[in-house]
Amino acid sequence: MTDKNITKDAMYDAVAPDDFESMLELDRYNNRSSAFDKIIAATHDHFWDPLDTKYIDFDEPFDMENEPLVPEEMIAALQTDYVSNHLSDPKERTRFINTMVLHNFSSILHGEQGALNLSASLCHVLKDQGAQEYAANQTREEARHVTGFAKYIKTRWGRPLECGAVLKDLLVEIIHAPEVYKKIIGMQMLVEGLAMGAFASFYNNIRDPLGKKLLQLVMTDEAFHHKFGKIWADRTVPKLDPEEHAIIEDWAAHCFQTLLFNLVSPTQQMALYADFGLDGMKVIEEFQKVMTDDVRRESMRESANIFRVLIKTLLNAGIITDRTRAFYGMYVDMEELKLEGDRMVGDDIAEDGIRYLQAINFKDRVVESIRVAAE
């Protein structure tokens, strides 16, 4: 247990990645935490294989040339007169929308790869056997997400886009961080929270049945991954001293701001705009005119808004204090958010997905319905 890791519960005790000798301590074998047992046992309920057509068939067609994957209201740049007027041809407009979706799905794919590597790294540093088994299970699940999104992108577009510099830098920072709290807050709570918000938003709007099914299958896993971070917060945050809380709170705000910039900043799509004959700087200028604080706050009221999910995650975990409350208050009504309770957007979608998977995996047995990430 080290100050740098800010460990407040033995089940999150960690060692250096190259300290395998600590894993051979005899007392460690008899001190397995039971905190993750229900999440581990539930892996059978939400198992799926992206390479097995009984779960998902990537040969399902969709007219990418003539049908937009999502409503154009989801494409921020199209809310500007400059971009909307420039893309007057229906086919070119559709191509622009679907290319913007490719940008988002490519970011998701890179994020899933980051989650895979981070989960594997946790197996090397967490001492508790239960925590290790959970991390090993998540590693396997993230691997199928990488396969699933890679196959979907190949089917619909052929090839993903490069990982944006901002997202790449954050993923590298989280994965290489020696501090366990940085890994858990950065990935298990924020990147996974971002994923749940993004998946729910796309699930509710995507017109491609194949994309919709993939999103639901992935969400059945992500709901449990998000729970791992919540368990850490429940057992850690109440025991923090003011200095430790400030360290964790500042790290969370740093990750949030980075993810916000990566997703909504038009500077992240400059090359994409150029491919459509658009002046990237002009797009940014027009975007800033329409994206006022009032517009931003109103869009955040929608429960499926991606960053609303992130802020709610941090608020419910007790990480946000008066030090950073005003920062998050620029995007949401914090009092309104607090009154919503613990239920997260995407939970219902994930639970429906689990029932779908139970029907496939246990069709010869009567199974009890389960709630997502049960306590």
Regions found by a protein language model. Name each.
Residues 1-119, 124-132, 155-162, 166, ...:
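Terminal targeting/low-complexity segments that flank the catalytic cores of oxidoreductases
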Residues 195-240:
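Active-site-proximal binding-pocket segments
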Residues 125, 140-141, 221, 225, ...:
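A short structural micro-motif
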Residues 111-118, 145, 191-198, 225:
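Amphipathic, well-ordered alpha-helical segments in soluble domains
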Residues 133-136, 213-216, 246:
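Short, charged, amphipathic alpha-helical segments
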Residues 149-202:
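Active-site-adjacent scaffolding segments
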Residues 128, 133-158:
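Carboxylate/His-rich catalytic cores and anion/metal-binding grooves
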